[in-house]
Amino acid sequence: MLTRLFVTGTDTAVGKTVVSRALLQALSQNGRTAVGYKPVATESKETSEGLRNQDALILQASSSIELNYQEVNPYPLQGDVIHACTDTLINYEKMTEGLQCLSAKADTVIVEGCGGWKVMMNDQRFYSDWVVQEQLPVILVVGIKLGCINHALLTAQAIINDGLPLLGWVANRINPGLAHYAETIAMLRDRLAAPQLGQLPYLPRPEEKPLAKYLDLTAISG
């Protein structure tokens, strides 16, 4: 089993946090200490303890060892992904230091991205440049909706073009009323050059549900 995994998505709001939580649960059930890391988190809210992001809080709660919030999310940003990531100075070295600290504490670190694969940072570099720098193998979350086949194939190709291994992909049913759901999954299986690691059904409040049962990590457990 690899010690560091990066979770990206075909778009924003496709279920990266839900799948990251499922991965953390599955790894913990297999006897590994697994922690979540979301270096950059947008749409954070002001609280009595400072800025907090809901996705990062879910990763913190789902980690198998106790972590403080700053370890999970060193950059909690207000606003949407476009403005937050371009208006705030993001230090890639700080992101790397956080990853190294968590790697020293846990068997596996699940790193969750921000938005999709090609998100621009404030210095005109892509977030994916940092992923390439750290040589993180990637798991792709495909939010099953109209247009997702195109988004998935383009994202997968971009990851491969950046020289990183695409370990696998996970389908997340974000639209319970989508027609031709089974056909969409079948086409993704045929077209994506990586194994399917799981399929999450549409679930109300998935952050409160056991999710490991929807994954099969056999393909990346060697």
Swiss-Prot record:
Q: Which cofactor does it need?
A: Mg(2+)
Protein role: Catalyzes a mechanistically unusual reaction, the ATP-dependent insertion of CO2 between the N7 and N8 nitrogen atoms of 7,8-diaminopelargonic acid (DAPA, also called 7,8-diammoniononanoate) to form a ureido ring.
Q: What is its main location?
A: cytoplasm
* Pathway named in the protein's UniProt entry: Cofactor biosynthesis; biotin biosynthesis; biotin from 7,8-diaminononanoate: step 1/2
One GO term in the molecular function aspect is: ATP binding
Reactions catalysed, semicolon-separated, are: (7R,8S)-7,8-diammoniononanoate + CO2 + ATP = (4R,5S)-dethiobiotin + ADP + phosphate + 3 H(+)
* Active site positions: K38
InterPro entries per record: DTB_synth_BioD (IPR004472), P-loop_NTPase (IPR027417)
Localization, per the record, is: Cytoplasm
Q: Which organism is the protein's source? A: Yersinia pestis
- Gene name of this polypeptide: bioD2
- Mind telling me which GO cellular component terms the entry cites? cytosol
Q: What is this protein called?
A: ATP-dependent dethiobiotin synthetase BioD 2
